[in-house]
Amino acid sequence: MKLNREDVLHIARLARLGLEEDEINRLSKELSALLEHFEVLQQVDTTGVEPTSQSTPVKSVLKEDTIKPSYAREDILSNAPRREGDYIRIRAVME
């Protein structure tokens, strides 16, 4: 599929891009080549191929969370510079 100048300008307007004349010509060629690759892919027979959304197995690289005992609330509150009941009082961050 060949994209002409008007197609490229339409796409640029949708993307809110301002293009120079040389960019319009270059993008017309590049986008046309890209669409031709997609046309080739459309011709591939995929009968019997199971649809997939992930080609490689998804494995979390994060380690498992482990629950550990925390400090006692009273120990933490006793070290706070200011306290209000069971809360640590800080200076206002926003007005």
Swiss-Prot record:
Gene3D superfamilies: Glu-tRNAGln amidotransferase C subunit, N-terminal domain (1.10.20.60). It is an enzyme of class 6 (ligase). It holds the Pfam family GatC. It catalyses: L-glutamyl-tRNA(Gln) + L-glutamine + ATP + H2O = L-glutaminyl-tRNA(Gln) + L-glutamate + ADP + phosphate + H(+); L-aspartyl-tRNA(Asn) + L-glutamine + ATP + H2O = L-asparaginyl-tRNA(Asn) + L-glutamate + ADP + phosphate + 2 H(+). SUPFAM superfamilies: Glu-tRNAGln amidotransferase C subunit (SSF141000). Its EC number is 6.3.5.-. Keywords: ATP-binding, Ligase, Nucleotide-binding, Protein biosynthesis. One of its GO terms (molecular function) is glutaminyl-tRNA synthase (glutamine-hydrolyzing) activity. Signal peptide: none annotated. The keyword Oxidoreductase does not apply. InterPro entries: Asp/Glu-ADT_sf_sub_c (IPR036113), GatC (IPR003837). One of its GO terms (biological process) is glutaminyl-tRNAGln biosynthesis via transamidation. It comes from the Bacteria. Belongs to the GatC family. Heterotrimer of A, B and C subunits. HAMAP family: GatC (MF_00122). Allows the formation of correctly charged Asn-tRNA(Asn) or Gln-tRNA(Gln) through the transamidation of misacylated Asp-tRNA(Asn) or Glu-tRNA(Gln) in organisms which lack either or both of asparaginyl-tRNA or glutaminyl-tRNA synthetases. The reaction takes place in the presence of glutamine and ATP through an activated phospho-Asp-tRNA(Asn) or phospho-Glu-tRNA(Gln). This is Aspartyl/glutamyl-tRNA(Asn/Gln) amidotransferase subunit C. It comes from Dehalococcoides mccartyi (strain ATCC BAA-2100 / JCM 16839 / KCTC 5957 / BAV1).
